[in-house]
């Protein structure tokens, strides 16, 4: 199979449309490496629908800012909330050290850039900051739990 300009244009169009970040293509002497970072995705809040269920949330939109994802949802009771998700794999901690005051608990109001937890990854303590203001309505992980990249940590009512 030979790569033509038309096939290459179609491929690049698909990469752009599907927001693919990394693509490596090699065929014979031809090699293409594409790295692209998407900073923002349009945000939209979709009203709840009784027939659809996704993790107890009928509507879900993912927004990426500064490599931290937030999932905006609308509950069945039409409460809008954002879900703070882990930007990395590691161990989740509610407080800066054992025995110290926890960063946030259910019912607390959080401000933009306020530290909400720590994720330890490769012996480094990474402070996770809220990128939205609101009230913590649920903490989805326990202190000391291992979390994956993209895993939901907390729900914040907006």
Swiss-Prot record:
NCBIfam families: BCCP (TIGR00531). Pathway: Lipid metabolism; fatty acid biosynthesis. The modification N6-biotinyllysine is found at residue 123. Residues 81-157 form the Biotinyl-binding domain. It is found in: Plastid, Chloroplast. This protein is a component of the acetyl coenzyme A carboxylase complex; first, biotin carboxylase catalyzes the carboxylation of the carrier protein and then the transcarboxylase transfers the carboxyl group to form malonyl-CoA. This is Biotin carboxyl carrier protein of acetyl-CoA carboxylase. PANTHER family: OXALOACETATE DECARBOXYLASE ALPHA CHAIN. One of its GO terms (cellular component) is acetyl-CoA carboxylase complex. One of its GO terms (molecular function) is acetyl-CoA carboxylase activity. GO terms for biological process: fatty acid biosynthetic process. The lineage of its organism: Eukaryota, Rhodophyta, Bangiophyceae, Bangiales, Bangiaceae. It comes from Pyropia yezoensis. Keywords: Biotin, Chloroplast, Fatty acid biosynthesis, Fatty acid metabolism, Lipid biosynthesis, Lipid metabolism, Plastid. The keyword Zinc-finger does not apply. It comes from the Eukaryota. InterPro entries: AcCoA_biotinCC (IPR001249), Biotin_BS (IPR001882), Biotin_Carboxyl_Carrier/Decarb (IPR050709), Biotin_lipoyl (IPR000089), Single_hybrid_motif (IPR011053).
